[in-house]
């Protein structure tokens, strides 16, 4: 079969490939083909799941023989208007490419004041951060073959959502990376639970994120819980959705107690609110 290329347009005009933007239709996250969003691409029916790749990373494929969907995490730095290629491999067929367009989304900006040494790092702190960043980059590229129990998530702690995903952040008036998670305001010690069933992939105390726990839900679908005051699970533990895994704290680079909650698909941080039921 010849190699084929399709265009996956915004959901309103590409019914043949895009899942309609219904809230959590069929147990899938809300589609949002924007930087930091999720593209849900219809791969059609076949007996076994096809293999999909995006930006060199394996992509989560969900569904069953009656219909498969690629659930693609779109990086925050994706270029608006670009047609990004999703490579799909099916048994006994040549690979095909499905391209989907990236729409525009405007994210707010935020000014934060922190200790000067948390912005201009000392040589020792910079070396520590670079080592931790390399470690976490490898962790966040994890792709395990087990399918997630669910693609819908619980809010992991009680409290108002205080800072949204994607904000362009300035620390002491200096630009830094966009906010790659959702912040939930809560007092120190508030219980934090697993947003979904998964395996504890990584536990650490990092310069910026403080005490941090990462859950692997399967097939490149990960959640991260940061700035914890305490962690109540160990690497390798299997934890069900809703089980306590730690407590809200103010560790790492923070201005006060809160939970920083991130969701990753195919190593890209995506908006957690697309998954919270």
Residue ranges of model-derived segments:
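Histidine-centered divalent metal-coordination motifs
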Residues: 179, 227, 258-262
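Conserved, short, structured surface segments that act as functional micro-motifs
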Residues: 211-217, 221, 237-277
